[in-house]
Amino acid sequence: MDEEIRRKILALLDQHRIMTIATLRPDGWPQATTVGYANEGLTLYFLCGPDSQKAANLARDDRVSLTIDHDTPQVMEITGLSMAARAQVVVDPTEAEKALRLLMLKYPQQASIPLPMPTPADVRIFRVTPMVISVLDYSKGFGHTDLVTC
């Protein structure tokens, strides 16, 4: 992967904390939902309820598509990422604790709220590993996309 593109991807991942992730429902229809995420390099983590539709969908098929972007008043300032990726349940307790710590770092305001953080036993934590990343940057031209295979 080109180092300039890698830096751009990491910058976009680091400056955002919400993504839209699409999983496949049992009937074959995609289901897109918004989730908070944290990343360590190109690896993303998110959590959901253990009995959620996302968790059930991913238990059947670990393929996901996701987008990370933001609203902008100028069309030519649109930037973002879309990915084809695999999402696996984090089963290692050390990695699960790390993922929860990373998520808390994305939401520092949460520390002042007197609600307990969920434990790995309370939620399903997923590790998202990108296979293909599309880097959208309209400042390089309308609809400009750099495609990266991981």
Question: What residue spans do the PLM features occupy?
Answer:
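Short gly/ser/thr-rich secondary-structure transition/capping motifs
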Residues: 3, 47-49, 109-110
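Short beta-strand segments in beta-sandwich/barrel cores
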Residues: 19, 44, 64, 87-88, ...
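Short beta-strand segments
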Residues: 17-50, 58, 65-70, 78-80
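Alpha-helix boundary recognition
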Residues: 13-14, 59-60, 104
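Short Pro/Gly-enriched beta-strand edge/turn motifs at strand-loop
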Residues: 15-20, 107-110
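Extreme N-terminal tail/first-helix region
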Residues: 1-18, 146-147
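Charged, gly/pro-rich active-site loop segments
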Residues: 75-150
